[in-house]
């Protein structure tokens, strides 16, 4: 089934020069990048995006990090795009759960700065795309 999913290349991925390689991996997987924007997220967008974590102790650090520098927000489309992107991204914790060969397994060392984000379900994708790309 053709799906759309939100992807974020977080500030650490942008700052460390991984954007080109990440986009190449998306394309090699057969997914299509249909929207892409380099921006520095404002706090309101970040807080809305991460609202499920608002009562957790790391919420403030998460918002501070995602708004600290430019990131790339994008919409990826393709067959089973959500699962395909999550497979490319690797496990959330880059050392304990991300396999070498995945984006996080290759480029990240901490769970707090783990290079990329991807929606985890069709419902999350719809909600997150509306937050980051309200006119799409």
UniProtKB/Swiss-Prot annotation:
Record-annotated active site: 117
Enzyme class: transferase
SMART domains: NDK
UniProt-listed SUPFAM superfamilies: Nucleoside diphosphate kinase, NDK
Compartments where found: Cytoplasm
Coiled coil: none
Alphabetized UniProt keyword annotations: ATP-binding, Cytoplasm, Kinase, Magnesium, Metal-binding, Nucleotide metabolism, Nucleotide-binding, Phosphoprotein, Transferase
Keyword presence, Nucleotide-binding: yes
Reaction equation(s) it catalyzes: a 2'-deoxyribonucleoside 5'-diphosphate + ATP = a 2'-deoxyribonucleoside 5'-triphosphate + ADP; a ribonucleoside 5'-diphosphate + ATP = a ribonucleoside 5'-triphosphate + ADP
Record-listed ATP binding positions: 10, 58, 86, 92, 104, 114
Any one GO biological process: CTP biosynthetic process
Main location: cytoplasm
Cofactors named for this entry: Mg(2+)
EC number in record: 2.7.4.6
Cellular component GO terms held in the UniProt record: cytoplasm
Signal sequence segment: none
GO molecular function: ATP binding; metal ion binding; nucleoside diphosphate kinase activity
HAMAP family: NDP_kinase
Family that this chain belongs to: Belongs to the NDK family.
Subunit architecture: Homotetramer.
Name of the protein this chain belongs to: Nucleoside diphosphate kinase
Organism: Corynebacterium urealyticum (strain ATCC 43042 / DSM 7109)
């Amino acid at each position: 089934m053709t799906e759309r999913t939100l992807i974020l290349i977080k500030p650490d991925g942008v700052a460390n020069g991984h954007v080109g390689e990440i986009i190449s991996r998306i394309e090699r997987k057969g997914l299509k990048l249909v929207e892409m924007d380099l921006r520095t997220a404002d706090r309101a967008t970040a807080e809305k995006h991460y609202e499920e974590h608002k009562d957790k102790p790391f919420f403030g650090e998460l918002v501070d990090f995602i708004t600290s520098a430019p990131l790339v927000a994008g919409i990826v489309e393709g067959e089973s795009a959500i699962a395909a992107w999550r497979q490319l991204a690797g496990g959330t914790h880059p050392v304990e759960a991300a396999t070498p060969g995945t984006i996080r397994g290759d480029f990240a060392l901490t769970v707090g700065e783990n290079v990329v984000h991807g929606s985890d379900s069709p419902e999350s994708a719809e909600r997150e795309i509306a937050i980051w790309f309200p006119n799409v």
